[in-house]
């Protein structure tokens, strides 16, 4: 499948979190990564893709860092109000897409603001494998280490079969209307939603797992940032 055969898509980037585990003076998406902020590098892969229709970044109220970035002035990038939880931010982003002319059956890719090492190859693979899928899915990586379940005392209660375990990454790709309904209904029901796929699962869907690169890391700790520094030219 050539690039022109890939489906057009919209992107939502929830970026209202503070990243307290980084112990930094600013949210982790605004930390320096080889001379540019993390979020700028995160957006690059999407803004350089010819099938992108538009991108919405969901920001905290009075975010002082975003306005000073070059990408904030891009005609492809719009803002939406971030929420208390990830699901709230994504819902806000989906509503903004509808205001921009997106349709309920359009594809939307939701991606972590602090996951800056997404490759064009992984993005194209996700788009190609899900282009005709009735549900959608997500990039994921098969578990490679032995997995243990712990009891309340921190002791091993069982060994889990890793052949059926995958690590959920992003982007996660679903139809706008279906994802909006799943997130909204889950929030009303008080269901704990950790990512978009979990909302779709709760709504009765079975998202498809698309294998991606293990180095598509989400920055959570200072060690993660240090590891990714080596991936980008200075």
Curated annotation (Swiss-Prot):
The record marks 162, 218 as: Positions MEP for the nucleophilic attack. Pathway: Isoprenoid biosynthesis; isopentenyl diphosphate biosynthesis via DXP pathway; isopentenyl diphosphate from 1-deoxy-D-xylulose 5-phosphate: step 2/6. It holds the Pfam family IspD. It comes from the Bacteria. Its EC number is 2.7.7.60. The record marks 21, 28 as: Transition state stabilizer. This is 2-C-methyl-D-erythritol 4-phosphate cytidylyltransferase. It comes from Pseudomonas aeruginosa (strain UCBPP-PA14).
């Amino acid at each position: 499948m050539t690039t022109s055969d890939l489906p057009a898509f919209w992107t939502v980037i929830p970026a209202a979190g503070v990243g307290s585990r980084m112990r930094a003076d600013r949210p982790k998406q605004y930390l320096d990564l080889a001379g540019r902020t993390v979020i700028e590098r995160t957006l690059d892969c999407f803004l350089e893709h010819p099938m992108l229709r538009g991108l919405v970044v969901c920001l905290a109220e009075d975010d002082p860092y975003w306005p000073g970035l070059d990408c904030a002035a891009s005609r492809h990038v719009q803002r939406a109000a971030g929420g208390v939880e990830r699901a709230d931010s994504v819902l806000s982003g989906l509503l903004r897409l509808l205001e921009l002319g997106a349709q309920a059956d359009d594809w939307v890719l939701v991606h972590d603001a602090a996951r800056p090492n997404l490759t064009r190859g992984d993005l194209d693979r996700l788009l190609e494998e899900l282009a005709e899928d009735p549900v959608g899915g997500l990039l994921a990586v098969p578990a490679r280490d032995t997995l243990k379940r712990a009891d309340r005392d921190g002791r091993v209660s069982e060994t889990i079969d890793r052949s059926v375990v995958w690590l959920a990454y992003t982007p996660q790709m679903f139809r706008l209307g279906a994802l909006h309904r799943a997130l909204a209904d889950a929030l009303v029901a008080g269901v704990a939603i950790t990512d978009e796929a979990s909302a779709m699962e709760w709504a009765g869907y079975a998202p498809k797992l698309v294998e991606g690169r293990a180095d598509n890391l989400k920055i959570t700790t200072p060690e993660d940032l240090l590891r990714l520094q080596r991936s980008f030219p200075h």
